[in-house]
């Protein structure tokens, strides 16, 4: 189960916020606009990666979420579970990577690494 751990308002009037999600194994910082979420509630939706690049297949099973301290950039490692909809799974998180061009040799079931400039909640 993914929980909304923290909401940090960027602009409350514009409903723009940084949202920290956790499944107790991984934490992902997302941008949300409009943000209508509440702290400590369950989050069941998919999240979206933007400016998806540096996509490549891993030689072994690996899961990781690495955030750049100075930006919203993330390096993600996980299982590519849906090649039709470009979905990456890390723990309980399902991340839509359709903003990027997935190489044709990557298929569902492969483990991949990818960089995104931002992760969003709609």
Per-range role (PLM):
Residues 40-53, 78, 108-122:
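Flexible glycine-rich surface loops and low-complexity tracts that mediate binding to linear polymers
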Residues 7-12, 24-26, 50-52, 79, ...:
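Generic structural motif
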Residues 1-12, 64-84, 114:
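Structural detector for short beta-strands of small beta-barrel domains
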Residues 1-3, 10-12, 25-28, 57-61, ...:
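Short amphipathic alpha-helical surface micro-motifs
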Residues 15-19, 84-89:
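Short aromatic-glycine-enriched beta-strand elements
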Residues 23-37, 90-108, 115-116, 120:
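Beta-strand/loop nucleic-acid-binding surfaces
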Residues 49-73, 117-122:
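OB-fold/S1-family single-stranded nucleic acid-binding modules
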Residues 15-58:
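Acidic (E/D-rich), amphipathic helical modules within compact regulatory domains
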């Amino acid at each position: 189960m993914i929980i909304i751990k923290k909401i940090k308002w960027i602009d409350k009037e514009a409903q723009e916020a940084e949202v920290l999600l956790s499944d107790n194994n991984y934490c992902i910082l997302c941008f949300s606009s409009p943000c209508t979420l509440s702290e400590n509630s369950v989050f069941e939706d998919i999240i979206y990666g933007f400016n998806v690049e540096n996509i490549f297949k891993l030689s072994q099973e690996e899961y990781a979420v690495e955030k750049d301290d100075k930006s919203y950039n993330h390096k993600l490692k996980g299982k590519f579970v849906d090649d039709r909809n470009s979905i990456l799974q890390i723990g309980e998180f399902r991340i839509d990577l359709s903003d990027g061009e997935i190489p044709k040799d990557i298929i569902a079931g492969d483990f991949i690494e990818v960089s995104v400039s931002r992760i969003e909640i709609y």
